[in-house]
Amino acid sequence: MKSPWRILVVSPLLLLPLHSSTSRAHDNQPGTIRSDHYTCVGCVLVVSVIEQLAQVHNSTVQASMERLCSYLPEEWVLKTACYMMVHVFGADIIKLFDKDVNADVVCHTLEFCKQEPGQPLCHLYPLPKESWKFTLEKARHIVKQSPIMKYTRSGAGICSLPFLAKICQKIKLAIKNSVPIKDVDSDKYSIFPTLRGYHWRGRDCNDSDKTVYPGRRPDNWDAHRDSNCNGIWGVDPKDGIPYEKKFCEGSQPRGIILLGDSAGAHFHIPPEWLTVSQMSVNSFLNLPTAVTNELDWPQLSGTTGFLDSASKIKENSIYLRLRKRNRCNHRDYQNISKNGASSRNVKSLIESLSRNQLLDHPAIVIYAMIGNDVCNGRKTDPVSAMTTPEQLYANVLKMLEALNSHLPTGSHVILYGLAHGAFLWDTLHSRYHPLGQLNKDVTYTQLYSFLGCLQVSPCPGWMSANETLRALTSERAQQLSETLRKIAASKKFTNFNLFYLDFAFQEVVEEWQKMGGQPWELIEAVDGFHPNEVALLLFADQLWEKVQRQWPDVLGKENPFNPQIEEVFGDQGGH
Ligand code: CA
Protein backbone atom coordinates (compact mmCIF):
# COMPACT_ATOMS: atom_id res chain seq x y z
CA MET A 1 0.00 0.00 0.00
CA LYS A 2 2.99 2.26 0.04
CA SER A 3 4.26 4.33 -2.78
CA PRO A 4 7.73 2.81 -3.00
CA TRP A 5 6.10 -0.06 -4.89
CA ARG A 6 6.58 2.25 -7.82
CA ILE A 7 10.31 2.19 -7.30
CA LEU A 8 10.01 -1.55 -7.45
CA VAL A 9 8.53 -1.35 -10.91
CA VAL A 10 10.52 1.40 -12.49
CA SER A 11 14.00 1.05 -11.15
CA PRO A 12 14.45 -2.66 -11.74
CA LEU A 13 13.28 -2.44 -15.31
CA LEU A 14 16.30 -0.35 -15.92
CA LEU A 15 18.06 -0.80 -12.65
CA LEU A 16 18.17 2.96 -12.80
CA PRO A 17 17.21 5.41 -10.08
CA LEU A 18 14.33 6.89 -12.07
CA HIS A 19 12.08 7.03 -9.06
CA SER A 20 13.61 10.23 -7.79
CA SER A 21 12.21 12.10 -10.77
CA THR A 22 8.80 10.48 -11.02
CA SER A 23 7.68 10.05 -7.45
CA ARG A 24 6.31 12.62 -5.12
CA ALA A 25 7.09 12.66 -1.50
CA HIS A 26 4.22 11.51 0.62
CA ASP A 27 3.39 8.84 3.16
CA ASN A 28 4.05 9.00 6.81
CA GLN A 29 5.52 5.55 6.95
CA PRO A 30 8.27 4.89 9.41
CA GLY A 31 11.55 6.11 7.98
CA THR A 32 13.13 2.72 8.46
CA ILE A 33 11.92 1.44 5.10
CA ARG A 34 14.72 1.88 2.64
CA SER A 35 14.30 2.16 -1.07
CA ASP A 36 17.17 -0.32 -1.58
CA HIS A 37 14.90 -3.00 -0.12
CA TYR A 38 12.58 -2.34 -3.01
CA THR A 39 15.56 -2.46 -5.35
CA CYS A 40 16.22 -5.95 -4.03
CA VAL A 41 12.62 -7.01 -4.74
CA GLY A 42 12.86 -5.40 -8.17
CA CYS A 43 16.14 -7.15 -8.97
CA VAL A 44 14.77 -10.55 -8.01
CA LEU A 45 11.67 -9.98 -10.16
CA VAL A 46 13.61 -8.83 -13.23
CA VAL A 47 16.27 -11.53 -12.99
CA SER A 48 13.53 -14.15 -12.59
CA VAL A 49 11.81 -12.85 -15.71
CA ILE A 50 15.07 -12.94 -17.70
CA GLU A 51 15.76 -16.47 -16.53
CA GLN A 52 12.25 -17.66 -17.37
CA LEU A 53 12.27 -15.97 -20.78
CA ALA A 54 15.40 -17.94 -21.64
CA GLN A 55 13.72 -21.10 -20.43
CA VAL A 56 10.44 -20.57 -22.31
CA HIS A 57 12.09 -19.56 -25.59
CA ASN A 58 14.95 -22.00 -25.17
CA SER A 59 17.32 -19.12 -25.83
CA THR A 60 20.55 -17.78 -24.37
CA VAL A 61 20.43 -15.35 -21.47
CA GLN A 62 21.79 -12.67 -23.78
CA ALA A 63 18.89 -13.19 -26.20
CA SER A 64 16.41 -13.25 -23.35
CA MET A 65 17.63 -9.91 -21.98
CA GLU A 66 17.39 -8.38 -25.43
CA ARG A 67 13.95 -9.86 -25.81
CA LEU A 68 12.82 -8.19 -22.58
CA CYS A 69 14.21 -4.84 -23.83
CA SER A 70 12.39 -5.25 -27.13
CA TYR A 71 9.09 -5.55 -25.23
CA LEU A 72 9.54 -2.24 -23.40
CA PRO A 73 7.82 0.91 -24.70
CA GLU A 74 9.75 3.76 -26.30
CA GLU A 75 8.60 6.30 -23.71
CA TRP A 76 11.32 7.92 -21.63
CA VAL A 77 13.89 6.14 -23.79
CA LEU A 78 13.11 3.01 -21.75
CA LYS A 79 13.90 0.65 -24.57
CA THR A 80 17.21 2.28 -25.47
CA ALA A 81 18.25 2.42 -21.86
CA CYS A 82 17.43 -1.24 -21.43
CA TYR A 83 19.66 -2.25 -24.37
CA MET A 84 22.38 -0.07 -22.89
CA MET A 85 22.12 -1.90 -19.58
CA VAL A 86 22.38 -5.25 -21.33
CA HIS A 87 25.43 -4.03 -23.20
CA VAL A 88 27.17 -2.92 -20.02
CA PHE A 89 26.06 -5.50 -17.48
CA GLY A 90 24.79 -8.41 -19.54
CA ALA A 91 28.06 -10.34 -19.58
CA ASP A 92 28.14 -10.65 -15.77
CA ILE A 93 24.57 -11.78 -15.54
CA ILE A 94 25.28 -14.39 -18.20
CA LYS A 95 28.33 -15.63 -16.31
CA LEU A 96 26.24 -16.03 -13.15
CA PHE A 97 23.48 -17.89 -14.91
CA ASP A 98 26.11 -20.22 -16.36
CA LYS A 99 26.80 -21.33 -12.80
CA ASP A 100 23.17 -22.26 -12.40
CA VAL A 101 22.36 -19.92 -9.50
CA ASN A 102 18.87 -18.58 -8.85
CA ALA A 103 17.65 -14.96 -8.84
CA ASP A 104 18.24 -14.54 -5.10
CA VAL A 105 21.89 -15.47 -5.49
CA VAL A 106 22.31 -13.27 -8.58
CA CYS A 107 20.87 -10.23 -6.78
CA HIS A 108 22.91 -10.80 -3.64
CA THR A 109 26.05 -11.30 -5.70
CA LEU A 110 25.46 -8.08 -7.58
CA GLU A 111 24.65 -6.41 -4.23
CA PHE A 112 21.20 -5.24 -5.20
CA CYS A 113 20.20 -7.31 -2.19
CA LYS A 114 22.23 -7.08 0.98
CA GLN A 115 22.00 -9.06 4.16
CA GLU A 116 22.64 -6.58 6.91
CA PRO A 117 24.48 -7.60 10.08
CA GLY A 118 22.13 -9.16 12.59
CA GLN A 119 19.32 -9.35 10.04
CA PRO A 120 17.89 -12.51 8.52
CA LEU A 121 18.68 -13.56 4.98
CA CYS A 122 15.78 -12.53 2.72
CA HIS A 123 15.10 -14.81 -0.22
CA LEU A 124 12.20 -15.58 -2.53
CA TYR A 125 13.26 -18.99 -3.81
CA PRO A 126 14.19 -22.02 -1.73
CA LEU A 127 17.79 -21.79 -0.50
CA PRO A 128 20.48 -23.45 -2.63
CA LYS A 129 21.46 -27.03 -1.75
CA GLU A 130 25.03 -26.07 -0.94
CA SER A 131 25.36 -23.60 1.90
CA TRP A 132 24.34 -20.03 1.15
CA LYS A 133 27.72 -18.65 2.13
CA PHE A 134 29.57 -21.05 -0.13
CA THR A 135 27.29 -20.41 -3.11
CA LEU A 136 27.59 -16.67 -2.70
CA GLU A 137 31.37 -16.77 -2.36
CA LYS A 138 31.62 -18.77 -5.55
CA ALA A 139 29.34 -16.40 -7.43
CA ARG A 140 31.12 -13.31 -6.13
CA HIS A 141 34.40 -14.60 -7.40
CA ILE A 142 32.97 -14.64 -10.94
CA VAL A 143 32.00 -10.96 -11.03
CA LYS A 144 34.72 -9.47 -8.83
CA GLN A 145 35.93 -6.93 -11.36
CA SER A 146 32.71 -6.19 -13.20
CA PRO A 147 31.29 -2.70 -13.94
CA ILE A 148 27.99 -3.57 -12.27
CA MET A 149 29.80 -4.06 -8.97
CA LYS A 150 31.48 -0.69 -9.26
CA TYR A 151 28.04 0.76 -9.63
CA THR A 152 26.30 -1.06 -6.80
CA ARG A 153 29.21 -0.42 -4.44
CA SER A 154 29.58 3.25 -5.24
CA GLY A 155 26.05 4.00 -4.00
CA ALA A 156 26.22 7.13 -6.13
CA GLY A 157 23.70 5.97 -8.69
CA ILE A 158 24.26 4.48 -12.06
CA CYS A 159 24.34 7.85 -13.79
CA SER A 160 27.64 8.57 -12.12
CA LEU A 161 29.27 5.99 -14.37
CA PRO A 162 30.89 8.06 -17.14
CA PHE A 163 29.69 5.89 -20.00
CA LEU A 164 26.08 6.17 -18.82
CA ALA A 165 25.93 9.87 -18.03
CA LYS A 166 24.68 10.79 -21.46
CA ILE A 167 21.86 8.29 -21.60
CA CYS A 168 20.77 9.29 -18.07
CA GLN A 169 20.59 12.89 -19.18
CA LYS A 170 18.41 11.83 -22.08
CA ILE A 171 16.05 9.84 -19.88
CA LYS A 172 15.66 12.63 -17.35
CA LEU A 173 14.82 15.05 -20.13
CA ALA A 174 12.31 12.64 -21.66
CA ILE A 175 10.53 12.26 -18.32
CA LYS A 176 10.52 15.99 -17.76
CA ASN A 177 8.98 16.56 -21.17
CA SER A 178 6.27 13.97 -20.59
CA VAL A 179 4.98 15.87 -17.55
CA PRO A 180 2.52 18.67 -18.27
CA ILE A 181 4.09 22.02 -17.57
CA LYS A 182 1.01 23.16 -15.70
CA ASP A 183 1.20 22.63 -11.95
CA VAL A 184 -1.35 19.85 -11.51
CA ASP A 185 -1.92 20.63 -7.86
CA SER A 186 -2.79 24.29 -8.10
CA ASP A 187 -5.70 23.68 -10.46
CA LYS A 188 -7.47 20.53 -9.38
CA TYR A 189 -9.16 19.63 -12.64
CA SER A 190 -7.10 18.73 -15.63
CA ILE A 191 -7.21 17.98 -19.32
CA PHE A 192 -4.44 15.38 -18.88
CA PRO A 193 -5.31 11.80 -17.91
CA THR A 194 -2.50 10.88 -15.52
CA LEU A 195 -0.51 12.71 -12.82
CA ARG A 196 -3.73 13.19 -10.84
CA GLY A 197 -5.55 14.29 -14.00
CA TYR A 198 -8.92 13.15 -15.29
CA HIS A 199 -8.27 9.53 -14.43
CA TRP A 200 -8.71 10.81 -10.88
CA ARG A 201 -11.40 13.47 -11.19
CA GLY A 202 -13.76 14.61 -13.93
CA ARG A 203 -12.06 16.13 -16.95
CA ASP A 204 -11.90 19.88 -17.15
CA CYS A 205 -13.67 21.38 -20.15
CA ASN A 206 -12.04 24.79 -20.07
CA ASP A 207 -8.51 24.65 -18.83
CA SER A 208 -8.01 28.41 -18.88
CA ASP A 209 -11.05 29.35 -16.77
CA LYS A 210 -11.01 28.40 -13.11
CA THR A 211 -14.73 29.07 -12.68
CA VAL A 212 -15.45 26.17 -15.03
CA TYR A 213 -15.21 22.67 -13.51
CA PRO A 214 -17.28 19.50 -12.98
CA GLY A 215 -19.70 19.54 -10.06
CA ARG A 216 -20.57 23.22 -9.86
CA ARG A 217 -24.09 24.57 -10.09
CA PRO A 218 -24.52 25.88 -13.61
CA ASP A 219 -23.75 29.54 -14.13
CA ASN A 220 -26.78 31.28 -15.62
CA TRP A 221 -28.16 27.80 -16.55
CA ASP A 222 -25.21 27.33 -18.89
CA ALA A 223 -27.03 29.22 -21.60
CA HIS A 224 -23.75 30.28 -23.23
CA ARG A 225 -21.13 27.85 -21.97
CA ASP A 226 -20.82 24.55 -20.14
CA SER A 227 -19.70 25.87 -16.76
CA ASN A 228 -19.97 22.46 -15.04
CA CYS A 229 -18.48 20.33 -17.83
CA ASN A 230 -21.41 17.90 -17.87
CA GLY A 231 -21.80 18.38 -21.61
CA ILE A 232 -25.19 20.11 -21.26
CA TRP A 233 -25.39 23.75 -22.31
CA GLY A 234 -26.99 26.20 -24.75
CA VAL A 235 -30.61 27.14 -25.36
CA ASP A 236 -33.36 25.08 -26.97
CA PRO A 237 -34.19 27.03 -30.15
CA LYS A 238 -37.79 25.78 -30.01
CA ASP A 239 -38.74 27.56 -26.79
CA GLY A 240 -35.69 29.60 -25.76
CA ILE A 241 -35.24 27.65 -22.49
CA PRO A 242 -31.63 26.71 -21.56
CA TYR A 243 -31.13 22.94 -21.76
CA GLU A 244 -29.46 22.78 -18.34
CA LYS A 245 -32.62 24.33 -16.80
CA LYS A 246 -34.96 22.14 -18.82
CA PHE A 247 -33.17 18.84 -18.19
CA CYS A 248 -31.41 19.29 -14.84
CA GLU A 249 -33.41 21.72 -12.68
CA GLY A 250 -34.79 19.86 -9.68
CA SER A 251 -33.08 16.64 -10.73
CA GLN A 252 -30.90 16.76 -7.59
CA PRO A 253 -27.50 16.42 -9.26
CA ARG A 254 -24.67 15.18 -7.06
CA GLY A 255 -21.09 14.09 -7.31
CA ILE A 256 -19.20 11.13 -5.92
CA ILE A 257 -16.00 11.61 -3.92
CA LEU A 258 -13.84 8.83 -2.56
CA LEU A 259 -11.45 9.36 0.33
CA GLY A 260 -9.50 6.15 0.09
CA ASP A 261 -6.27 4.21 0.11
CA SER A 262 -4.54 2.13 -2.54
CA ALA A 263 -7.52 -0.23 -2.73
CA GLY A 264 -9.87 2.67 -3.52
CA ALA A 265 -7.44 4.03 -6.09
CA HIS A 266 -7.20 0.49 -7.51
CA PHE A 267 -3.53 -0.32 -7.05
CA HIS A 268 -2.59 -2.89 -9.65
CA ILE A 269 0.61 -4.34 -11.06
CA PRO A 270 -0.37 -6.12 -14.27
CA PRO A 271 0.52 -9.83 -14.07
CA GLU A 272 1.53 -9.57 -17.75
CA TRP A 273 4.64 -7.74 -16.60
CA LEU A 274 5.81 -10.93 -14.87
CA THR A 275 4.20 -13.76 -16.78
CA VAL A 276 6.78 -14.82 -19.34
CA SER A 277 4.71 -17.39 -21.22
CA GLN A 278 2.45 -14.66 -22.62
CA MET A 279 4.95 -11.81 -22.63
CA SER A 280 5.07 -9.63 -25.73
CA VAL A 281 5.42 -6.03 -26.82
CA ASN A 282 1.78 -5.58 -25.75
CA SER A 283 2.55 -6.51 -22.16
CA PHE A 284 4.20 -3.18 -21.31
CA LEU A 285 2.16 -0.70 -23.36
CA ASN A 286 0.44 0.43 -20.17
CA LEU A 287 3.64 0.92 -18.18
CA PRO A 288 4.04 4.70 -18.67
CA THR A 289 0.39 5.32 -17.75
CA ALA A 290 0.68 3.08 -14.72
CA VAL A 291 3.81 4.76 -13.43
CA THR A 292 2.48 8.29 -13.89
CA ASN A 293 -0.65 7.17 -12.02
CA GLU A 294 1.32 5.91 -9.03
CA LEU A 295 0.52 2.31 -10.13
CA ASP A 296 -3.12 3.09 -9.43
CA TRP A 297 -5.94 2.68 -11.93
CA PRO A 298 -8.73 4.95 -10.63
CA GLN A 299 -10.17 5.08 -14.15
CA LEU A 300 -11.11 1.42 -13.64
CA SER A 301 -11.92 1.52 -9.92
CA GLY A 302 -15.15 0.46 -8.28
CA THR A 303 -16.08 3.91 -7.02
CA THR A 304 -15.00 6.33 -9.75
CA GLY A 305 -14.09 4.14 -12.74
CA PHE A 306 -15.41 5.36 -16.07
CA LEU A 307 -13.60 3.16 -18.60
CA ASP A 308 -14.94 -0.20 -19.71
CA SER A 309 -13.57 -2.99 -17.61
CA ALA A 310 -11.45 -5.61 -19.36
CA SER A 311 -12.84 -8.17 -16.95
CA LYS A 312 -15.95 -9.88 -18.21
CA ILE A 313 -17.95 -8.54 -15.32
CA LYS A 314 -21.00 -6.41 -16.18
CA GLU A 315 -21.13 -4.42 -12.93
CA ASN A 316 -20.46 -0.70 -13.15
CA SER A 317 -18.73 1.76 -10.84
CA ILE A 318 -20.72 3.91 -8.42
CA TYR A 319 -19.94 6.93 -10.60
CA LEU A 320 -21.28 5.33 -13.78
CA ARG A 321 -24.44 4.30 -11.94
CA LEU A 322 -24.98 7.83 -10.64
CA ARG A 323 -24.45 9.11 -14.17
CA LYS A 324 -26.89 6.61 -15.61
CA ARG A 325 -29.46 7.61 -12.96
CA ASN A 326 -29.07 11.27 -13.77
CA ARG A 327 -27.01 12.30 -16.77
CA CYS A 328 -26.65 15.79 -15.30
CA ASN A 329 -24.02 14.12 -13.02
CA HIS A 330 -21.69 13.56 -15.99
CA ARG A 331 -18.00 13.95 -14.99
CA ASP A 332 -18.76 14.75 -11.37
CA TYR A 333 -16.33 12.32 -9.70
CA GLN A 334 -13.24 12.69 -7.54
CA ASN A 335 -10.98 9.88 -6.46
CA ILE A 336 -9.05 11.43 -3.59
CA SER A 337 -7.15 8.29 -2.70
CA LYS A 338 -3.52 7.70 -2.00
CA ASN A 339 -1.38 4.64 -1.59
CA GLY A 340 -0.64 4.35 2.10
CA ALA A 341 -3.54 6.56 3.23
CA SER A 342 -5.28 5.87 6.53
CA SER A 343 -7.27 7.70 9.20
CA ARG A 344 -3.95 9.15 10.30
CA ASN A 345 -3.39 11.18 7.15
CA VAL A 346 -6.89 11.57 5.73
CA LYS A 347 -7.02 15.20 6.76
CA SER A 348 -4.29 16.07 4.31
CA LEU A 349 -6.29 14.34 1.58
CA ILE A 350 -9.25 16.58 2.28
CA GLU A 351 -7.10 19.56 1.41
CA SER A 352 -7.06 18.36 -2.18
CA LEU A 353 -10.80 17.70 -2.23
CA SER A 354 -12.57 20.19 -4.44
CA ARG A 355 -16.05 21.23 -3.35
CA ASN A 356 -17.30 24.76 -2.91
CA GLN A 357 -20.01 24.95 -0.29
CA LEU A 358 -21.83 27.80 -2.01
CA LEU A 359 -21.23 27.17 -5.69
CA ASP A 360 -21.28 23.38 -6.07
CA HIS A 361 -23.78 20.55 -6.00
CA PRO A 362 -23.90 18.27 -2.95
CA ALA A 363 -21.75 15.17 -2.96
CA ILE A 364 -21.70 11.60 -1.75
CA VAL A 365 -18.42 11.12 0.07
CA ILE A 366 -17.21 7.60 0.78
CA TYR A 367 -14.53 7.22 3.43
CA ALA A 368 -12.86 3.88 2.74
CA MET A 369 -9.55 3.41 4.54
CA ILE A 370 -9.75 -0.34 4.59
CA GLY A 371 -6.33 -1.44 5.74
CA ASN A 372 -3.51 0.93 6.56
CA ASP A 373 -4.66 1.60 10.11
CA VAL A 374 -3.74 -2.00 10.88
CA CYS A 375 -1.15 -2.53 8.13
CA ASN A 376 2.25 -0.95 8.44
CA GLY A 377 5.78 -1.61 7.37
CA ARG A 378 7.16 -2.46 10.78
CA LYS A 379 8.21 -6.01 11.29
CA THR A 380 9.03 -5.67 14.93
CA ASP A 381 5.79 -5.53 16.84
CA PRO A 382 3.25 -4.56 14.15
CA VAL A 383 0.46 -4.52 16.74
CA SER A 384 1.85 -1.56 18.64
CA ALA A 385 2.02 0.46 15.43
CA MET A 386 -1.69 -0.04 14.64
CA THR A 387 -4.19 2.76 15.11
CA THR A 388 -6.14 2.33 18.34
CA PRO A 389 -9.95 2.74 18.45
CA GLU A 390 -9.46 5.97 20.44
CA GLN A 391 -7.05 7.36 17.86
CA LEU A 392 -9.36 6.39 15.02
CA TYR A 393 -12.28 8.07 16.78
CA ALA A 394 -10.35 11.31 17.10
CA ASN A 395 -8.98 11.16 13.53
CA VAL A 396 -12.36 10.49 11.96
CA LEU A 397 -14.13 13.17 13.98
CA LYS A 398 -11.57 15.73 12.88
CA MET A 399 -12.06 14.61 9.29
CA LEU A 400 -15.84 14.85 9.57
CA GLU A 401 -15.60 18.37 10.96
CA ALA A 402 -13.38 19.33 8.04
CA LEU A 403 -15.86 17.78 5.63
CA ASN A 404 -18.69 19.67 7.26
CA SER A 405 -16.95 22.91 6.42
CA HIS A 406 -16.26 21.82 2.80
CA LEU A 407 -19.42 20.09 1.64
CA PRO A 408 -22.55 21.78 0.30
CA THR A 409 -25.72 21.22 2.36
CA GLY A 410 -27.55 18.04 1.43
CA SER A 411 -24.41 15.96 1.04
CA HIS A 412 -23.97 12.40 2.35
CA VAL A 413 -20.99 10.72 3.95
CA ILE A 414 -20.60 6.95 4.12
CA LEU A 415 -17.99 5.46 6.44
CA TYR A 416 -16.78 2.11 5.20
CA GLY A 417 -15.51 -0.62 7.50
CA LEU A 418 -12.04 -2.18 7.44
CA ALA A 419 -11.10 -5.21 5.36
CA HIS A 420 -11.17 -8.81 6.52
CA GLY A 421 -7.56 -9.55 5.66
CA ALA A 422 -7.41 -13.04 7.15
CA PHE A 423 -8.95 -14.07 3.86
CA LEU A 424 -5.63 -13.41 2.09
CA TRP A 425 -3.61 -16.06 3.84
CA ASP A 426 -6.44 -18.56 3.93
CA THR A 427 -7.03 -18.22 0.20
CA LEU A 428 -3.54 -17.76 -1.19
CA HIS A 429 -0.83 -19.25 1.00
CA SER A 430 -0.44 -22.51 -0.88
CA ARG A 431 -1.11 -21.10 -4.36
CA TYR A 432 1.62 -20.19 -6.84
CA HIS A 433 2.52 -16.55 -7.47
CA PRO A 434 2.63 -15.53 -11.19
CA LEU A 435 6.42 -15.71 -10.93
CA GLY A 436 6.25 -19.25 -9.62
CA GLN A 437 3.77 -20.71 -12.06
CA LEU A 438 6.28 -21.79 -14.71
CA ASN A 439 8.48 -23.85 -12.41
CA LYS A 440 6.13 -24.30 -9.45
CA ASP A 441 8.67 -22.72 -7.16
CA VAL A 442 7.19 -19.50 -5.70
CA THR A 443 4.09 -19.62 -3.52
CA TYR A 444 2.42 -16.66 -1.82
CA THR A 445 3.81 -17.95 1.48
CA GLN A 446 7.29 -17.39 0.03
CA LEU A 447 6.34 -13.98 -1.37
CA TYR A 448 4.86 -12.84 1.95
CA SER A 449 7.91 -14.00 3.86
CA PHE A 450 10.31 -12.36 1.36
CA LEU A 451 8.48 -9.00 1.54
CA GLY A 452 8.11 -9.25 5.31
CA CYS A 453 11.80 -10.05 5.73
CA LEU A 454 12.76 -6.97 3.68
CA GLN A 455 10.24 -4.89 5.65
CA VAL A 456 8.40 -3.87 2.50
CA SER A 457 5.28 -5.96 3.06
CA PRO A 458 2.17 -3.83 2.52
CA CYS A 459 0.60 -5.60 5.49
CA PRO A 460 2.84 -7.70 7.73
CA GLY A 461 -0.06 -8.39 10.09
CA TRP A 462 -2.16 -10.22 7.54
CA MET A 463 0.52 -11.33 5.07
CA SER A 464 2.10 -13.58 7.63
CA ALA A 465 2.45 -17.25 8.45
CA ASN A 466 1.92 -16.32 12.11
CA GLU A 467 -1.67 -17.23 12.88
CA THR A 468 -1.75 -15.33 16.17
CA LEU A 469 -0.57 -12.16 14.47
CA ARG A 470 -3.18 -12.51 11.72
CA ALA A 471 -5.87 -12.96 14.36
CA LEU A 472 -4.69 -9.89 16.30
CA THR A 473 -4.72 -7.84 13.11
CA SER A 474 -8.26 -8.95 12.32
CA GLU A 475 -9.35 -8.23 15.87
CA ARG A 476 -8.05 -4.68 15.71
CA ALA A 477 -9.61 -4.13 12.29
CA GLN A 478 -12.93 -5.25 13.72
CA GLN A 479 -12.62 -2.87 16.68
CA LEU A 480 -11.89 -0.01 14.29
CA SER A 481 -14.89 -0.88 12.11
CA GLU A 482 -17.03 -0.94 15.24
CA THR A 483 -15.73 2.53 16.15
CA LEU A 484 -16.74 3.83 12.73
CA ARG A 485 -20.19 2.28 13.17
CA LYS A 486 -20.58 4.01 16.54
CA ILE A 487 -19.55 7.37 15.14
CA ALA A 488 -22.11 7.06 12.34
CA ALA A 489 -24.82 6.11 14.82
CA SER A 490 -24.14 8.93 17.28
CA LYS A 491 -22.89 11.99 15.42
CA LYS A 492 -24.86 14.58 13.47
CA PHE A 493 -23.57 17.23 11.09
CA THR A 494 -25.32 20.19 9.53
CA ASN A 495 -24.22 19.71 5.92
CA PHE A 496 -24.40 15.95 5.49
CA ASN A 497 -26.08 12.78 6.67
CA LEU A 498 -23.74 10.16 8.03
CA PHE A 499 -23.91 6.39 7.44
CA TYR A 500 -21.84 3.29 8.08
CA LEU A 501 -21.43 0.24 5.88
CA ASP A 502 -19.58 -2.98 6.69
CA PHE A 503 -16.84 -4.31 4.45
CA ALA A 504 -18.93 -7.41 3.74
CA PHE A 505 -16.34 -9.44 1.90
CA GLN A 506 -18.01 -12.77 2.49
CA GLU A 507 -21.08 -11.56 0.56
CA VAL A 508 -18.86 -10.49 -2.34
CA VAL A 509 -17.16 -13.89 -2.35
CA GLU A 510 -20.52 -15.64 -2.38
CA GLU A 511 -21.74 -13.44 -5.21
CA TRP A 512 -18.61 -14.26 -7.17
CA GLN A 513 -18.96 -17.97 -6.51
CA LYS A 514 -22.54 -17.82 -7.77
CA MET A 515 -21.09 -16.42 -10.99
CA GLY A 516 -18.80 -19.44 -11.19
CA GLY A 517 -15.67 -17.75 -9.82
CA GLN A 518 -13.10 -18.85 -7.27
CA PRO A 519 -12.28 -16.77 -4.15
CA TRP A 520 -8.58 -16.34 -5.07
CA GLU A 521 -9.62 -14.67 -8.32
CA LEU A 522 -10.70 -11.63 -6.29
CA ILE A 523 -7.17 -10.70 -5.13
CA GLU A 524 -4.45 -8.90 -7.06
CA ALA A 525 -2.22 -11.65 -8.40
CA VAL A 526 1.12 -9.83 -8.20
CA ASP A 527 0.95 -8.27 -4.74
CA GLY A 528 -1.29 -10.93 -3.21
CA PHE A 529 -2.94 -8.23 -1.15
CA HIS A 530 -5.26 -5.73 -2.84
CA PRO A 531 -8.80 -6.46 -4.01
CA ASN A 532 -8.67 -6.61 -7.81
CA GLU A 533 -10.88 -4.99 -10.41
CA VAL A 534 -13.55 -7.68 -10.24
CA ALA A 535 -13.68 -7.47 -6.45
CA LEU A 536 -13.88 -3.67 -6.52
CA LEU A 537 -16.78 -3.73 -8.96
CA LEU A 538 -18.58 -6.37 -6.89
CA PHE A 539 -18.08 -4.19 -3.82
CA ALA A 540 -19.50 -1.23 -5.74
CA ASP A 541 -22.51 -3.33 -6.68
CA GLN A 542 -23.02 -4.36 -3.08
CA LEU A 543 -22.71 -0.80 -1.80
CA TRP A 544 -25.15 0.48 -4.39
CA GLU A 545 -27.73 -2.19 -3.57
CA LYS A 546 -27.46 -1.60 0.17
CA VAL A 547 -27.68 2.16 -0.08
CA GLN A 548 -30.59 1.97 -2.47
CA ARG A 549 -32.41 -0.35 -0.08
CA GLN A 550 -31.64 1.43 3.19
CA TRP A 551 -31.12 5.10 2.31
CA PRO A 552 -32.46 5.75 -1.20
CA ASP A 553 -32.24 9.54 -0.72
CA VAL A 554 -28.45 9.28 -0.91
CA LEU A 555 -28.50 8.36 -4.59
CA GLY A 556 -31.02 10.97 -5.75
CA LYS A 557 -33.84 10.56 -8.20
CA GLU A 558 -33.90 8.98 -11.61
CA ASN A 559 -33.90 11.84 -14.13
CA PRO A 560 -36.84 11.47 -16.56
CA PHE A 561 -34.97 13.62 -19.12
CA ASN A 562 -32.08 11.18 -19.52
CA PRO A 563 -33.23 10.02 -22.99
CA GLN A 564 -33.58 13.62 -24.20
CA ILE A 565 -30.13 14.54 -22.86
CA GLU A 566 -28.68 11.63 -24.76
CA GLU A 567 -30.58 12.60 -27.88
CA VAL A 568 -29.39 16.22 -27.86
CA PHE A 569 -25.87 15.83 -26.41
CA GLY A 570 -24.80 12.29 -27.33
CA ASP A 571 -22.02 11.13 -25.02
CA GLN A 572 -21.85 14.64 -23.50
CA GLY A 573 -18.26 15.14 -24.54
CA GLY A 574 -17.12 11.78 -23.15
CA HIS A 575 -14.71 11.51 -20.27
CA1 CA B 1 -23.64 22.15 -18.08
From Swiss-Prot:
The record marks 344, 378 as: Interacts with lipopolysaccharide. Its main location: secreted. Ca(2+) 2 binds at residues 185, 187, 204, 206, 209, 212. It is found in: Secreted; Cytoplasmic vesicle. Residues 37-69 are annotated as: Important for enzyme activity, localization to cytoplasmic vesicles, and protein stability. Gene3D superfamilies: Saposin-like, SGNH hydrolase. It is an enzyme of class 3 (hydrolase). Disulfide bonds join 40-113, 43-107, 69-82, 122-453, 159-168, 205-229, 248-328, 375-459. Residues 172-176 are annotated as: Lipopolysaccharide binding. One of its GO terms (molecular function) is calcium ion binding. Its cofactor is Ca(2+). One of its GO terms (biological process) is negative regulation of inflammatory response. It comes from the Eukaryota. Residues 26-34 form a propeptide. Ca(2+) 1 binds at residues 183, 185, 187, 189, 204, 207. Its EC number is 3.1.1.77. Ca(2+) 3 binds at residues 222, 226, 228, 230, 232, 244. It catalyses: a 3-(acyloxy)acyl derivative of bacterial toxin + H2O = a 3-hydroxyacyl derivative of bacterial toxin + a fatty acid + H(+). The keyword Mitochondrion does not apply. Removes the secondary (acyloxyacyl-linked) fatty acyl chains from the lipid A region of bacterial lipopolysaccharides (LPS). By breaking down LPS, terminates the host response to bacterial infection and prevents prolonged and damaging inflammatory responses. In peritoneal macrophages, seems to be important for recovery from a state of immune tolerance following infection by Gram-negative bacteria. This is Acyloxyacyl hydrolase.
